[in-house]
């Protein structure tokens, strides 16, 4: 997905290349960010692995993999999953066939993945992707698409209310109303990140609402409310509660990322 959070086979001591995802020179701040990103992602991965009872013998789909292989935090979940004994598939709207060479054992599938052509998937993992899929409706639909593939999904995303925006590397501006934030980004020449199609940051409240709505709509489509349900005063909002677990790692003093595991 279009993000400068890119990487290659992860290890905390891996050399960071001199250029970022868009071909620009990497600064010392970028190098620190990538090392910190790797540590935070490892925290989220360990939490995810524990929440699903280990990944050995399980089949995981990495949804929204980046084609980048130059940075230490890119596709790190894929490597860790393979090392821990999972069967891993990957899919992306970008060309990622070369990742099968980078990560032996990985199987790349066409995008968008057809659930009917996939083996049974235990969990879909989407790392730092949902903030890049578009507006609120598109983010809900993205979650629904993932829920159509597996009974549980895990999403990670930067926290909108961390004081630093890791995409633009600007502090605090992203706390403004979205329209004002985008207007300032355009003034600063950051037109790519000013487009909602490329970046829509989420808070925990935003993400919880999105996943709740996506699960509710998925359940409604699969099992419509009957007259008997209505007679009992039940609706989709009153059915079994959604099973949602959170991980909120911190960086530079506050929650930097959100990871949510959703079971339907």
Model-predicted regions and their roles:
Residues 152-181:
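Conserved class I S-adenosyl-L-methionine
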Residues 52-53, 58-163, 260-264:
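Conserved SAM-binding loop
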Residues 194-215:
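Short alpha-helix
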Residues 8-54:
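Class I SAM-dependent methyltransferase Rossmann-like catalytic core
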Residues 237-264:
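Core SAM-dependent methyltransferase catalytic element
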Residues 215-232, 239-249:
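Conserved S-adenosyl-L-methionine
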Residues 30-31, 187-197:
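Short glycine/proline- and acidic residue-enriched helix-loop micro-motifs
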Residues 36-44, 69, 134, 138, ...:
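Soluble or luminal CAZymes and related metallo-dependent hydrolases
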